[in-house]
């Protein structure tokens, strides 16, 4: 899709399984993983903006929720709108919708910074959280290997359940001939960001180009918490310069009881 980029991170979604509302709120406080207003009109406006502004193709800032090892070049600006929704109730997660905007800017020296706005989920009270993020790529080899580190700071500003939180990660990727890219790394979330206690684990990604317009992708956060989801899907070129993402997030726990939902993302570059 960060900076965590979580698509920018540009930018990264989860679930306290104790109750569905807590689960979805925790999930969207995070994304790796970011909304302004939860009105459906925001989605319509954002989609029109995506179509209207001419942009160049750019590196992918996140896969879906897991940050990619791509970093924007200096002066490049990327924006994205993520739309998550579950159309029906289940015993684990009730129906909901969420809109998550983010913007990412390349600052040079293989560094990008971004801002995500999370916490607006329908139905329920707004719990808007500002999530500034940074990603740095200290290594990019001609052998296809890359290494990045990143950090997200969570600052709740409405209906605060905690004062501040943090997500830090490090990961490597390997790009093979034909374009296949595998990503693997580790993460740490501080208390209250994705669970009532600190959580650490692994984050993984897979990207396989099919042609110039379509790729099959998937990512996964390990762990039983509000970021613990496996999300497979596709990345596609909506137009010559606009990218769309369509995936389905499946929880690491209680999936058989309905802990899964749709995830759509629309991204574009301003330059």
Residue ranges and their predicted role:
Residues 1-61, 271:
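Cleavable N-terminal export/targeting peptides
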């Amino acid at each position: 899709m960060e900076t965590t980029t979580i698509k920018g991170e540009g930018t990264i979604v989860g679930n306290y399984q104790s109750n569905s509302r807590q689960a979805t709120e925790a999930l969207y406080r995070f994304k790796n993983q970011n909304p302004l207003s939860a009105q459906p009109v925001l989605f319509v406006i954002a989609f029109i903006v995506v179509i209207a502004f001419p942009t160049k193709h750019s590196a992918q800032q996140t896969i879906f929720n897991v940050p990619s090892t791509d970093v924007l070049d200096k002066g490049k600006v990327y924006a994205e709108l993520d739309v998550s929704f579950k159309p029906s109730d289940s015993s684990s997660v009730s129906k909901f919708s969420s809109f998550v905007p983010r913007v990412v800017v390349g600052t040079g020296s293989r560094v990008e910074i971004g801002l995500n706005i999370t916490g607006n989920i329908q139905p329920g009270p707004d719990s808007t959280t500002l999530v500034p993020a940074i990603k740095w790529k200290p290594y990019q080899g001609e052998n296809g290997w890359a290494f990045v580190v990143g950090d997200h700071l969570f600052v709740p500003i409405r209906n605060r359940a905690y004062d501040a939180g943090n997500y830090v990660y490090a990961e490597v990727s390997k790009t093979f001939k034909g374009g296949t890219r595998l990503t693997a790394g580790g993460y740490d979330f501080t208390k209250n960001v994705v669970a009532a206690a600190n959580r650490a684990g692994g984050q993984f990604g897979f990207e396989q180009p099919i042609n110039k317009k379509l790729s099959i992708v998937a990512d996964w956060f390990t762990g039983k918490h509000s970021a613990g989801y496996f999300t497979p899907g596709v990345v596609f070129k909506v137009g010559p310069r606009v990218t769309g993402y369509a995936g389905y997030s499946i929880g690491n726990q209680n999936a058989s009881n309905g802990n899964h939902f749709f995830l759509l993302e629309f991204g574009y570059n301003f330059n």
